[in-house]
């Protein structure tokens, strides 16, 4: 996962979108300038009319646009907010600074869902569904996004049959996720899962302290953990080598 692709959430009409196409997974999404629509919000208009000290950068825009995959022609639709920002330059011929404004925008909704990392195909369906739900929230609500990631860990514990309740005095008491992770059978990723859980906890508390980089780093940890569980390259390489050595030649194919 290239974290630099996802820490950037502010774009212009000339930006390059290094996102994977939802359909073919290639990085071939291209911004369609003729499909880009902006409209000043009514609140922004009212503020502009009532304030003499108003400046153009204070405009708030609702935006909509499309990206099209050059490889498979899938179209991705997005909505968001934006505002004009000055990108002036010094003109040597005029010997003066020339003011130019460009619309910067941030998507708050993207459809079809962009996957921030590739989920292994052998990952349990319920875990996959919860992670995809978090991808949808990444653009608009980081706290809810983090909470979805945390829920995916709860489901992962269920899939691995990690004890969910303790019984005492005839009562069934839920076991905290932290303690369930400590009992997770794949000890090599326990610390990874605990780190993911802590960020998920922050989202659950609605503290508004989370930043985009926090979620992106958490996705990096989650990607690593899932690959170790369901797409262990090292284990596959060792398996291939073992089969070749046992046959003293090429592996048997189906």
What kind of region is each of these model predictions?
Residues 3-6, 17, 23-58:
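Short recognition patches in nucleic-acid-associated and regulatory proteins
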Residues 14-20, 62-65:
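Short metal-coordination and nucleic-acid-contact micro-motifs, chiefly zinc-binding Cys/His arrays
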Residues 22-25, 67-70:
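Cys/His/Pro-rich metal-binding microdomains
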Residues 68-126:
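Helix-loop junctions and short alpha-helical segments
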Residues 109, 158-194, 198:
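Short, charged amphipathic alpha-helical segments flanked by flexible coils
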Residues 124-142:
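A long, hydrophobic alpha-helical segment
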Residues 142-164, 203:
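Hydrophobic alpha-helical packing segments in soluble, helical-rich domains
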Residues 191-246:
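Charge-enriched, short contiguous segments at helix-coil
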